[in-house]
């Protein structure tokens, strides 16, 4: 198969969570799959953290803005490559795509009522873009991947998609994540308890 993967922002220096998921997935595919041919579409950036290999081709697409990159440059590139499918990795995708579409939908926070409006101009535009694009592309997707059974349930309840369209595939974890030795002298300075749960994440 010829498989196209959108990984637009993985070359930017300050990567976000979705960028790392896409990057590590592609790295693992490079190690594991030497039969299918992959075309990775990326926006140019300073951190060239991925190189082409035998069956994995890095294709840089230049475009001034994210929406134009995704809605104009990406579909044109896909049309010229003629892959068997396009996998978009970060919640959004082209509204018009000439090949079957697979989408990774990490969450639907942007479709819910906002608790705060203290966003930068860039974040504000991204929020509106996702609200506009996501509901329109979901019916066109052959398959939608989300990151947990919990998120799958939330998406099904909120958007009433066919159950067979949406699958949960849990993220892997990098080998640099491991259990740290206990350091009670440090933790007791901040948490006066033997057992505790320290959580970092969104508020949804």
Regions found by a protein language model. Give the residues of each.
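Carbohydrate transferase catalytic cores enriched for Leloir-type hexosyltransferases
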Residues: 1-204
